[in-house]
UniProtKB/Swiss-Prot annotation:
The keyword Heme is annotated on this UniProt entry: yes
Taxonomic superkingdom: Eukaryota
Origin species: Euroscaptor micrura
UniProt cross-references to Pfam families, sorted A to Z: Cytochrom_B_C, Cytochrome_B
Record's function text: Component of the ubiquinol-cytochrome c reductase complex (complex III or cytochrome b-c1 complex) that is part of the mitochondrial respiratory chain. The b-c1 complex mediates electron transfer from ubiquinol to cytochrome c. Contributes to the generation of a proton gradient across the mitochondrial membrane that is then used for ATP synthesis.
The encoding gene: MT-CYB
Protein name (record): Cytochrome b
Gene Ontology process terms (BP): mitochondrial electron transport, ubiquinol to cytochrome c
């Protein structure tokens, strides 16, 4: 008799995805982040569900309901901080996952990569709307500033912003719809992640060498299941330390002040994971130009397969490209730092130079370096 896991219609899918899946024998810990992102998403949906049981999406009671969760609900403080810091872990894993894809040329799987870019946008939208829900000062002003960017769209901009707001300013209607979208989007993300996995399993995983691994495959279970469990334990440990010892480390103190439309905070800034994009937005003195740069700073990822000029897939054997890749990482860290600084000298010029370098590296320098490496290797 054949094993049930190989014959049952549902078990068969799970078996072919997580048990008998042929995987390259040499994939490193950089390939752990897919499973970690799945764990993050599950954690966010579960903690979010329990928070939604006690949260009220009304401007008069939203802030109080979050306070009530932290003070009066059993382990409410834990659920709330797991959700808030879980988002930070989610983005750390996302950035490392995308960085791995860029370094090892995983973007050559076009369908998988493009779904990934859509997933990144969806997660960013979800995180932004979630940040608005506690209805603190930074929630309100962050929502006002970011939604206002759409008014830069010619002709329809103002109407579009007022349509999203549901009125003439960020108010009750805005908060209610943001809560609705924040609740539904993670389930859409889960479905997209399924499609992401579906496309990945059409081709199989890439590996550090960038070469075909068809000649040397091993079963996913037990080799990579145990490896993923180890990665998960490390991540859960890091998240636990963050939540239990310094839960407010990555948050903004201004968000403990209830939203006040009559009082603008001195420095409006988003959560740390959006700071690099915020710095690019601020570095252009024109509203529409800034918005375009902001969108393109993420959308540029979709161009990566077209900008690949090397005859090798991975950067493993390409030292010049490696140097430029790590320069890009340093540049993104610089942008993240600048995004959290006030708009004054010398931060303005540093932000502008870092923004120019960001686009120059991806669009010009890295493709040129790849061509140069082809010539050096006489390919």
């Amino acid at each position: 008799m054949t094993n049930i896991r190989k014959t049952h219609p549902l078990m068969k899918i799970i078996n072919n995805s997580f048990i008998d899946l042929p995987a390259p024998s040499n994939i490193s810990s950089w390939w752990n982040f897919g499973s970690l992102l799945g764990i993050c998403l599950t954690l966010q949906i579960l903690t979010g569900l329990f928070l939604a049981m006690h949260y009220t999406s009304d401007t008069t009671t939203a802030f109080s309901s979050v306070t009530h969760i932290c003070r009066d609900v059993n382990y409410g403080w834990l659920i709330r901080y797991l959700h808030a810091n879980g988002a930070s872990m989610f983005f750390i894993c996302l950035f490392l996952h995308v960085g791995r894809g860029l370094y090892y040329g995983s973007y050559m799987f076009m369908e998988t990569w493009n779904i990934g870019v859509i997933l990144l946008f969806a997660v960013m939208a979800t995180a932004f709307m979630g940040y608005v829900l506690p209805w603190g000062q930074m929630s309100f002003w962050g929502a006002t500033v970011i939604t206002n960017l759409l008014s830069a769209i010619p002709y329809i901009g103002t109407d579009l912003v007022e349509w999203i707001w549901g009125g003439f300013s960020v108010d009750k209607a805005t908060l209610t719809r943001f809560f609705a979208f924040h609740f539904i989007l993670p389930f859409i993300i889960a479905a997209l992640a399924g499609v992401h996995l579906l496309f990945l399993h059409e081709t199989g995983s890439n590996n550090p060498s960038g070469l075909s691994s068809d000649t040397d495959k091993i079963p996913f279970h037990p080799y990579y299941t145990i490896k993923d469990i180890l990665g998960a334990l490390v991540m859960i440990l890091a998240l636990s330390i963050l939540v239990l010892f310094s839960p407010d480390l990555l948050g903004d103190p201004d968000n403990y002040i209830p939203a006040n439309p009559l009082n603008t905070p001195p420095h409006i800034k988003p959560e740390w994971y959006f700071l690099f994009a915020y710095a690019i937005l601020r570095s252009i003195p024109n509203k529409l130009g800034g918005v375009l740069a902001l969108v393109f700073s993420i959308l540029i990822l979709a161009l990566m397969p077209l900008l690949h000029t090397s005859k090798q897939r991975s950067m493993m054997f390409r030292p010049i490209s490696q140097c430029l890749f790590w320069l890009l990482v340093a540049d993104l860290l610089t942008l993240t730092w600048i995004g959290g600084q006030p708009v004054e000298h010398p931060f303005i010029i540093i932000g502008q130079l870092a923004s120019i370098l960001y686009f120059a590296l991806i669009l010009i320098l890295m493709p040129l370096a790849s061509l140069m490496e082809n010539n050096l290797l006489k390919w």
